[in-house]
């Protein structure tokens, strides 16, 4: 298996090559074949997001407000063939960058008006493909300060250019694109702390952006107090009616909210408390039948299942009715799971405890656990095949014994076959003489 991850402490990209069963917390377990650091720029310039553009290109969104286009090239690793498997490693090189995509002043203004003491720090919250192209794919990058930047990547010249930029209301936790139909429309939803969900439409040339719908908060609670609004993640569902958008949000306060833009009052059609003890959630990843951007390919809220991480150390699996199905790796994760990523087969998890873990989505069995030396902000899986390991001395001896035993058995079988053949030939000759 091969993963790339963003390591905060060194501000680097790390490549790890390993097999299933790898566990660096157990000395006698299988260990990684390769861990290497690339493009390290320190904590203040750490990587917020990674996007795998092609087999030879990556986009990196850095905490300094820059987007980097990085080329990758596989080269053979020099190994002792008697002790290690053969594999290639990756070399990375910066090709182009765009900087100045943050607006810290917006967040400083919000912080000055807030009762909270902590400063809100700008960062990239989204980086994804919005328009495919064999030559010039288009990407969206969004920041907590509300900057939405549309980027074009020239695959031939390995250059990136900014083709449009827009401002939306801050602070922003997510900007989710609706990708469940083949429409030319670019409909997106965004929201954040005291920033209720809004749906916006981006024009086909990416130059104009317009509001099309805005959510209202849930009613006051049973003692007449306003309920805080802080959606941290949103995923769309399919719609059975043209122009109507259905979606779920996860709130910081561990609520699952179901919305339909067809609802008359623009409030959630349902709100469910997921965790009863005041745990705070930070993410939502739908598992099962999803679009390339992780939206749910069904219109039935009750059919979905999703993963969510809290702000302490737990990762949970829930169904669409808000029922807790399981805790993932209960007791093993010891720090905030700052990153969870889902593929069609695997759950990738990393965080404050500096480990990256790979789970099988079929049964949530831990496949690998690797200490990375830094807080993990993003992970992508490049390969899921295992390397063929050279045989140990004990295995070689066993193999030779089996081969020797097989040779003896084959020799005995050949002798028996020869004897049987001779008997048959002798019988044929006797029959022929009698016929004469």
Curated annotation (Swiss-Prot):
Where, subcellularly, is it found?
Answer: Nucleus, Nucleolus
Disulfide linkages recorded for this protein, renumbered to the chain, are: none
Q: Which SUPFAM superfamilies match?
A: WD40 repeat-like (SSF50978)
Its BP terms in the Gene Ontology are: ribosomal large subunit biogenesis; rRNA processing
The highest taxon in the source lineage is: Eukaryota
Q: Does the keyword Nucleus apply?
A: yes
Q: What is its main location?
A: nucleus
Q: Which InterPro entries match?
A: WD40_repeat_dom_sf (IPR036322), WDR74/Nsa1 (IPR037379)
User: Where, by residue number, does the polypeptide cross the bilayer?
Assistant: none
Q: Which UniProt key words apply to this protein?
A: Nucleus, Ribosome biogenesis, rRNA processing
* Any one GO CC term of the record: nucleolus
* Main function: Involved in the biogenesis of the 60S ribosomal subunit.
What does the similarity note say?
A: Belongs to the NSA1 family.
Q: How does it assemble?
A: Component of the pre-66S ribosomal particle.
Provide the protein name. Answer: Ribosome biogenesis protein NSA1
Q: Whose protein is this, by species?
A: Kluyveromyces lactis (strain ATCC 8585 / CBS 2359 / DSM 70799 / NBRC 1267 / NRRL Y-1140 / WM37) (Yeast)
Q: Which gene encodes it?
A: NSA1
């Amino acid at each position: 298996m091969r993963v790339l991850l963003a390591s905060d402490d060194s501000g680097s990209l790390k490549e790890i090559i390993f097999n299933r069963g790898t566990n660096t917390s157990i000395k006698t377990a299988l260990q990684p074949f390769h861990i290497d650091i690339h493009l390290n720029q320190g904590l203040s310039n750490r990587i917020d997001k990674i996007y795998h553009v092609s087999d030879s290109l990556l986009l990196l969104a850095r905490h300094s407000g820059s987007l980097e286009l990085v080329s990758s090239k596989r080269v053979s690793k020099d190994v002792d063939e008697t002790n290690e498997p053969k594999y290639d490693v990756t070399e990375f090189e910066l090709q182009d960058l765009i900087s100045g995509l943050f607006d810290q002043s917006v967040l400083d203004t919000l912080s000055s008006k807030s009762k909270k003491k902590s400063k809100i720090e700008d960062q990239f919250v989204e980086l994804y493909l919005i328009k495919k192209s064999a030559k010039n794919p288009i990407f969206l990058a969004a920041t907590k300060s509300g900057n939405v930047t549309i980027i074009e990547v020239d695959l031939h010249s390995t250059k990136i250019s900014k083709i449009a930029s827009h401002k939306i209301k801050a602070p922003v936790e997510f900007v989710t694109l609706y990708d469940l139909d083949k429409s030319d429309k670019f409909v997106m939803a965004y929201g954040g702390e005291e920033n209720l969900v809004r749906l916006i439409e981006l024009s086909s040339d990416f130059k104009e952006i317009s509001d099309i719908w805005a959510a209202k908060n849930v009613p006051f609670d049973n003692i007449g107090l306003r309920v805080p609004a802080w959606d941290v993640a949103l995923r769309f569902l399919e719609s059975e009616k043209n122009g109507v958008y259905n979606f779920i949000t996860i709130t910081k306060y561990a609520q699952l909210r179901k919305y339909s833009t067809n609802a008359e009052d623009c409030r959630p059609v349902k709100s469910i408390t997921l965790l009863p003890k005041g745990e705070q959630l930070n993410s939502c990843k739908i598992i099962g039948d999803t679009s390339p951007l992780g939206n749910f390919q069904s219109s039935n809220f009750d059919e979905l299942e999703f993963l969510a991480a809290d702000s302490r150390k737990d990762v949970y699996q829930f169904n669409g009715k808000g029922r807790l199905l399981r805790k993932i790796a209960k007791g093993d994760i010891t720090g905030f799971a700052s990153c969870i990523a889902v593929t069609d087969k695997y759950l990738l998890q990393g965080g404050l405890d500096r480990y990256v873990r790979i789970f099988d989505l079929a049964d949530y069995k831990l496949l690998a656990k690797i200490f990375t030396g830094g807080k993990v902000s993003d992970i992508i899986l490049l390969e899921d095949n295992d390397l063929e390991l050279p045989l140990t001395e004990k295995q070689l001896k066993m193999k030779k014994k089996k081969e020797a035993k097989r040779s003896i058995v084959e020799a005995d079988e050949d002798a028996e076959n020869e004897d049987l053949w001779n008997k048959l030939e002798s019988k044929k000759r006797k029959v022929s003489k009698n016929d004469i």
